[in-house]
Amino acid sequence: MPLRIVFLGSPAFAVAPLERLVADARYQVVGVVTQPDRPAGRGRASVATPVKQAALRLGVPVLTPETLRDPAAVAELAALRPDVGVVAAYGEILRRDVLAIPPLGYVNIHPSLLPLYRGPSPVAGAILNGDAETGVTIMLIDAKMDSGPILAQRTVPLPPDARTGPLTQELFTIGADVLVETLDAYARGAITPQPQDHARATFTKLLTRDDGIIDWTQPAVRIERMTRAYDPWPGATTMWRGAPLKIIAARVIADRCADVPPGTLIDTADGPAVATGNGLLALITVQPAGKRPLPAADWRRGLRLSGGERLGDASARLSGGEAVH
């Protein structure tokens, strides 16, 4: 008989694992649990999560509880009689009563090489640190965050131009491939879960808008990584003439720069560039507040510069916060 699976996930990159499970005859997805519909867009119309939309298309029953702390939601989940749960960025930490429902527990897809980068923003963390490789981990969930035993891992190179959005999608697609083979082997007892080396653990945080504020006293290398690590959220942002300016793409063009204060806008043979605490950062694509992204050279042509104008105010703060993944 097929393995009975309940799938918990919400964002677009969690759709690939769901589709792979539904298409595999070894598995029966008996239900999907996802976040409730939320208002979105300018009209604030109620919008289902990408996982809910996929589940309805695939003909899988869907549960959308406000929280799995609700006893009624826990009872609905238990009524599905799953053998195992699969979690892919569901959006809520599972409590012990939920963890106890499937006999085989819950298998999680985590987009890092655990124990590195536990927590909610592992892809951004790897990019920001300039790692040469990253990967995906298939693991069992326990009561602590991303600390459970490992079933399988897949390592992939981390390209120097990687951005969090596309890389997250790629890792979950790879994770879907690893998952469908690992899950069957785990259910048959052919895999022995391996405990993590907790002494090697590193952690990531829930990102807020403030994390994306550029401090131009930082090295150019780190600021360039910010433009990729914080795409799509929260973005790498600075202030220019009293309004936010998002730096979408940039390139380090010098290890050192002229003797000008960090944040100073400079014209170079490579186009507009900004002095940093260590190096010169050429701007490639920017997005002024309320406008579409445009080449930085076009943005610069529209400016009348007075000498020594500077970008940024590292003490500025923006409101709000949300998770990357």
From Swiss-Prot:
UniProt: (6S)-5,6,7,8-tetrahydrofolate binding residues: S112, L113, L114, P115
Record's GO cellular component terms: cytosol
CDD domains: FMT_core_Met-tRNA-FMT_N, Met_tRNA_FMT_C
A Pfam entry, by short name: Formyl_trans_C
Keywords: Protein biosynthesis, Transferase
InterPro entries cross-referenced by the UniProt entry: Fmt (IPR005794), Formyl_trans_C (IPR005793), Formyl_trans_C_sf (IPR037022), Formyl_transf_N (IPR002376), Formyl_transf_N_sf (IPR036477), Formyl_transferase-like_C_sf (IPR011034), Met-tRNA-FMT_C (IPR044135), Met-tRNA-FMT_N (IPR041711)
Superkingdom of source: Bacteria
SUPFAM superfamilies given in the database record: FMT C-terminal domain-like, Formyltransferase
Disulfide bond entries: none
Chemical reaction(s) catalysed: L-methionyl-tRNA(fMet) + (6R)-10-formyltetrahydrofolate = N-formyl-L-methionyl-tRNA(fMet) + (6S)-5,6,7,8-tetrahydrofolate + H(+)
E.C. no: 2.1.2.9
Enzyme class, spelled out: transferase
Keyword Protease: no
Any one GO molecular function term: methionyl-tRNA formyltransferase activity
Family membership: Belongs to the Fmt family.
UniProt function note: Attaches a formyl group to the free amino group of methionyl-tRNA(fMet). The formyl group appears to play a dual role in the initiator identity of N-formylmethionyl-tRNA by promoting its recognition by IF2 and preventing the misappropriation of this tRNA by the elongation apparatus.
This protein's name: Methionyl-tRNA formyltransferase
Organism per entry: Roseiflexus sp. (strain RS-1)
Originating gene: fmt
